[in-house]
Amino acid sequence: DEKPKLILPTPAPPNLPQLVGGGGGNRKDGFGVSVDAHQKVWTSDNGGHSIGVSPGYSQHLPGPYGNSRPDYRIGAGYSYNF
């Protein structure tokens, strides 16, 4: 007696953002930090078109001249795969 098997499709992976960060410096001159991300926010049904957003932040922290103003940025991009 063979029972029917239920076959489910493999779930799509979550649309996780890409993160990039970095920094460096020394105690005398201060430290720079930077963080950027990219997130795809829309993809066409056929996967040929997509739109993404890219926010970011950077700042120079304590040094001989104090902290720099934080730099906040955001961008958007369109991609077409052919």
Curated annotation (Swiss-Prot):
Family: Belongs to the attacin/sarcotoxin-2 family.
Organism listed in the record: Protophormia terraenovae (Northern blowfly)
Protein known as: Diptericin-A
Compartment list: Secreted
Modified residues (Phenylalanine amide): 82
GO annotations of cellular component type: extracellular region
GO terms, biological process: defense response to bacterium; innate immune response
Domain of life (superkingdom): Eukaryota
This protein's UniProt keywords: Amidation, Antibiotic, Antimicrobial, Immunity, Innate immunity, Secreted
This protein's record includes keyword Secreted: yes
Misc. comment: There seems to be a family of diptericin in protophormia. Diptericin A is the predominant member.
Chief site of localization: secreted
